[in-house]
């Protein structure tokens, strides 16, 4: 995955999670999230998305209040749905936020 390090500027949250912003225009963002295999269970805080959220699990596994999503899963969260995602194993997720993120 050398391309990740060469082409992405990462923001490290210090919780085992880092974010790489691929695109942003106004409130719309396309980002990569990478979580270590040893990430703390509360590394992602409860949040919602005014315009919904779509994500593709590229590696690892994500789970939240609504289900478990292994690598290859495409997930859509409806507008204003609040969730608290967790990860299992080293995880890489491609995420689209049409209208940003809101803390719950």
Predicted feature locations:
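Conserved hydrophobic/aromatic beta-strand scaffold that supports enzyme active sites
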Residues: 19-21, 30-34, 54, 74-76
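Short histidine-centered beta-strand/loop micro-motifs
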Residues: 21, 32-33, 42-49, 65-67, ...
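Glycine- and acidic-residue-biased ligand/ion/polar-headgroup-sensing regions
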Residues: 39-64, 71
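Ligand-binding loop in jelly-roll beta-barrel domains
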Residues: 68, 79-104
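Residue-level marker of beta-strand positions
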Residues: 73-74, 82
């Amino acid at each position: 995955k050398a391309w990740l390090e060469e082409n992405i500027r990462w923001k490290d949250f210090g919780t085992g999670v880092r974010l790489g912003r691929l695109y942003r225009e106004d409130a719309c963002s396309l980002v990569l999230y990478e979580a270590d295999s040893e990430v703390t269970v509360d590394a992602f805080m409860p949040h919602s998305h005014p315009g919904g959220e779509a994500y593709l699990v590229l590696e690892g596994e994500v789970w939240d209040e609504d289900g478990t999503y292994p690598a290859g899963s495409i997930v859509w969260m409806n507008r204003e749905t609040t969730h608290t995602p967790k990860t299992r194993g080293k995880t890489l997720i491609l995420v689209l936020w049409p209208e940003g993120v809101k803390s719950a």
